[in-house]
């Protein structure tokens, strides 16, 4: 596994979307097939020995990593989406944004009682979206084994919000 290749494939965009932000652009990683393959391999190595029934990908960049990981691990893949994007009956959890409230939804039949669940997203910042996704999994009576992120912004302490559930990350800024 080549962590340096993964890290070097991510473009840093200063002052986006506003001054003072150092945006981590993963599109360059996705354009490098070997770096993308290394990222999926890093997730796989971390969880290959765990009994996971379902991998939940958080909209939208979480889908990019969760779907191939679910295929590689031989388990189900479930979408966690913004409100109004799923066509059947859903269950939701609201969470706070800097200027307002948003929500995350999943189909009510997406998780079975007792399913062991891994929740995947591209980046962990404050943890609000991941925590809300975990709340939906719990409402559906799934057991969260871990959260997994390509990138964690350690200074924002999102991992503390997700305790006591373990948090895995490939890169840290």
Give, region by region, the residue ranges found by the protein language model.
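Conserved G/P- and acidic residue-centered "switch" motifs that form tight phosphate/ATP-binding loops
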Residues: 122, 127
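Conserved acidic residues
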Residues: 53, 115, 145
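Short, glycine/charge-rich flexible loops or terminal/linker lids adjacent to PRPP-binding catalytic cores
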Residues: 78-117
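PRPP-dependent phosphoribosyltransferase catalytic core
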Residues: 2, 131-173
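Short Gly/Thr/Asp-enriched flexible loops that form oxyanion-binding sites at enzyme active sites
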Residues: 64-75, 134
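Short, hinge-like loop/turn segments at secondary-structure boundaries
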Residues: 73-74, 94-98, 163-166
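Active-site-facing substrate-recognition patch
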Residues: 1-51
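Short glycine-rich phosphate-binding loop at a beta-alpha junction
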Residues: 52-59
């Amino acid at each position: 596994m080549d962590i340096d290749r993964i890290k070097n494939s991510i473009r840093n965009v200063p002052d986006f979307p506003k001054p003072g932000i150092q945006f981590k652009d993963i599109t360059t990683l996705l354009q490098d097939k070997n770096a993308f393959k290394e990222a999926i391999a890093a997730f796989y190595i971390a969880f290959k020995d765990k009994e996971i029934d379902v991998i939940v990908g958080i909209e939208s960049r979480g889908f990019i990593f969760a779907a191939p990981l679910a295929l590689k691990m031989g388990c189900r893949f479930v979408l966690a989406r913004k409100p109004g994007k799923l066509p059947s009956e859903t269950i939701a959890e609201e969470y706070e944004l800097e200027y307002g409230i948003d929500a995350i939804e999943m189909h009510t039949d997406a998780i079975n009682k007792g399913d062991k669940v891994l929740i995947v997203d591209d980046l962990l910042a404050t943890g609000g979206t991941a925590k809300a996704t975990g709340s939906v999994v719990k409402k559906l009576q799934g057991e969260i084994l871990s959260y997994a992120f390509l990138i964690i912004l350690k200074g924002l302490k999102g991992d503390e919000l997700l305790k006591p559930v373990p948090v895995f990350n490939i890169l840290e800024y």
